[in-house]
Amino acid sequence: MKVSHWLIPLALATAWPIQSLQAQTQEASTQAPKLVVSIVVDQMRADYLTRFEDLYTGGIQTLMSEGESFINAHYSHAPTYTGPGHATIYTGTDPRFHGIIANDWYDASLKRSVYCVEDDQVAPVGSSSDAHRRSPKNIRSTTWTDELEWATQGKAKVIAFSIKDRGAICAAGHYGDAAYWIDSDAGFVSSSHYMDDLPKWMMRFNRSHDPSSYMTGSWDRLLDVSHYDALAGPDQSDFERVPKGAKSATFPYDLKAMQSAYNGAFKSTPAGNTLLVDAALVAVKAEGLGQDDITDVLAISFSATDYLGHAMGPRSQEVMDMYLRLDLDLKHLFESLDLLVGKGNYLVTFTADHGASDNPMQAKADGFPAELWAPADLEAELRVLMHLALIDNDKVLNLSNDQIYLSSREKDLAVAVRNAILVHPAIAEAWTWEEIRLSPDPYAQLRRNGSDKRSGQVFYALKPGHLAYGPTGTTHGSGYHYDSHVPLIFMGKAFNPQAMHNERAYIRDMAPTLSKVIGIASPSACTGNPLWVSPANK
């Protein structure tokens, strides 16, 4: 269990770059809300806002009509994954400084991959599985939620929910009150970093809201099929993965059969989103979030959109329908918060941790330049090229995250590897870490993600539309627009309804924006810039 959770260690409080010692206090901001609702939709491309705009009638429509939108918001790093994306949202800096360079990375000293939120020094809470030994120890910066705890001497309540552990932990930060994520058997769980035992209200929720209880009946299209035919691809597609327990990747789906075949099936259906909203609203009531003048935080990372996106791809009718149903889940969330906290008393942020590519084979069939490699095949082919360049295989420790880890940091070895792989038809460009570290743009995205201790010695970028993945669904990770461009909306009394900004904004700007609105210091490694100007200065 956390000890004096608002006493931030010196190592985090002084992380580079050093913040002003004259920290703002929460009382300095007249715009501070009673509750910040931080929403992240995993794998939501920016074009999902406009593509389905005429069909949104709920929470997403409310965000677009009542929020202030930054329609050219991007991640400034690559690779673009869930871990780095969430860490960037909450720390206000890039992976180079917050340290979460990928969902996992190779550690040469341990001779294995390290998961971004793994921690064998903590115990699982709510489950006996070692898979839930998780904490934020690998995040090198404070988060804006940490700074809120610091500014209020621990009086603020910070509670985060996600299906994925990393989605909740990056939001709760080092000193949040709770991070909850899903175990398919036990329900919501946490770790001893945040608590000794699940609170009684969560135990009751897990007993009464087993994930399988959401998987009854059938999942069919919310609207008439004509809408889906107009805005998505055909329902029958060779580029979509058939779920376990289903006969085909077409509507309608027998949810009970899917859940019986695989107890994690709910994670890739709209039920996964509904479960999170239900749990979050119980937490608001049980923990009294937003009930006094000290700003609290409710963070929700919707993971089902990512699970489904990986299986079906962005042109699928299933993905389209999930977003239309998420729109209704968010409507329920906002209407409930209007009653529980008061309309105008809470601030909402809305973004995504990354986008997604079209399925390369689907794009290729439609005449676009694209190609697909099985990940194992691409690695094998790159190793052959290095072998042909007389590079010993034992000098190549690992290939992951579009990086190559070598047994030494010799410049000549890295250059030889770079030159060897450049001839592969999937590779657009390759660089040594030294080249990236010392050079300006166009290496900026990679430089912002690189870390002397956690990154490889050679980086490479696949060509646009080229993926190392399976034949169905899609993935993400590049620095191209389809992966970096995401929604960014702020909704609350501090922001201008329906205001729309075309200039480039970065997701690392979110944390300093919220810090300024709330009246707290920015996170310790923050490199972003506030997007908000006080009404008094407009």
Regions found by a protein language model. Give the residues of each.
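Active-site His/acidic residue clusters
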Residues: 169-178, 253-264, 268, 291-326, ...
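Short, structured active-site-proximal loop/turn typified by the sulfatase FGly-forming signature C/S-X-P-X-R
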Residues: 50-97, 157-161
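Long, low-complexity, polar/charged, intrinsically disordered or flexibly structured peripheral segments
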Residues: 211-282
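Non-catalytic, well-ordered alpha-helical segments in soluble enzyme domains
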Residues: 62, 141-150, 401-431, 493, ...
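Secreted, luminal/periplasmic, and some membrane-associated catalytic domains
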Residues: 81, 103-133, 141, 146, ...
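A long, amphipathic alpha-helix that forms part
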Residues: 266-292, 305-346, 514
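Active-site regions of oxyanion-processing enzymes, predominantly non-cytosolic
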Residues: 36, 150, 155-162, 168-171, ...
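Active-site-proximal N-terminal segment of extracellular/periplasmic enzymes that hydrolyze or transfer
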Residues: 24-68
